[in-house]
Amino acid sequence: MSRIGQTFTALKAQNRKALISFITAGDPGKGLTVPLMHALVDAGTDIIELGVPFSDPMADGPVIQRASERALANKVGLKDVLAMTAEFRKVNTSTPVVLMGYANPFEHMGYETFAEAAKTAGVDGVLTVDIPPEESLGVSDVFKAHDLDPIFLLSPTTPESRVAQVAAVAGGFIYYVSLKGVTGSANLDTEEVARKVAMVRKHCDLPVGVGFGIRDAATAEAVARIADAVVVGSRIVNEIETAPEGECGARVKHLVADLRRGVDAASKQTENK
């Protein structure tokens, strides 16, 4: 079983939901990414999503776009992201790390070369934003051959037939995007999310994580009542962007600890029913 699978199995045994936290590698500085990864874990993160900087992050809103721009200005590329993961693994061998990015950097390195290097570095899964499931079979096979879980996005507009396609090739967990549009959007409709998550579960045994629009403990709790995992990105990246110099780690830890409390409150409600 993969590290991602082990994490979800252990949490399920404790009647808890996963908190998945996203940061962009190299933002705000090249030397701050690994300390931030440890800060995320210390504050209660179960799985880290590490964004691979890219010059045209079309699925991302302005907050994460700016993070990518800062990381690229810091000259952080895919090889650096893998090196950061390897550095993190010297201390932490249990928290799964998922690389989230666009196909171009992976293609440029070559999928086979990338998958081998990612496995060696200690990466557990890869979410390629712009590869649709019908085009992903060969890539997914390469990832799986190197024990990397291929993770896919589903959205409110994804038809049921496509959900079945994704279920056939996905690993790790399904990432359901709870809002139309780009990352960082607001106005979370939990009833609609609940309907969609139920539909996804009809086709797939993998855990379902829900992201986009989660801002605080209350929205994290609402989503944790529905999904197996709560995914938070823009809110954390915004905290990194606005933190005074030297306070980034402390601010992120404070925010993530609050999100963790929200996620765990949903589990406590379930226990008390």
Swiss-Prot record:
GO terms for molecular function: tryptophan synthase activity. Its EC number is 4.2.1.20. It catalyses: (1S,2R)-1-C-(indol-3-yl)glycerol 3-phosphate + L-serine = D-glyceraldehyde 3-phosphate + L-tryptophan + H2O. Pathway: Amino-acid biosynthesis; L-tryptophan biosynthesis; L-tryptophan from chorismate: step 5/5. It comes from the Bacteria. The keyword Lyase applies. GO terms for cellular component: cytosol. Transmembrane segments: none annotated. Gene3D superfamilies: Aldolase class I. Tetramer of two alpha and two beta chains. This is Tryptophan synthase alpha chain. The lineage of its organism: Bacteria, Pseudomonadati, Pseudomonadota, Betaproteobacteria, Nitrosomonadales.
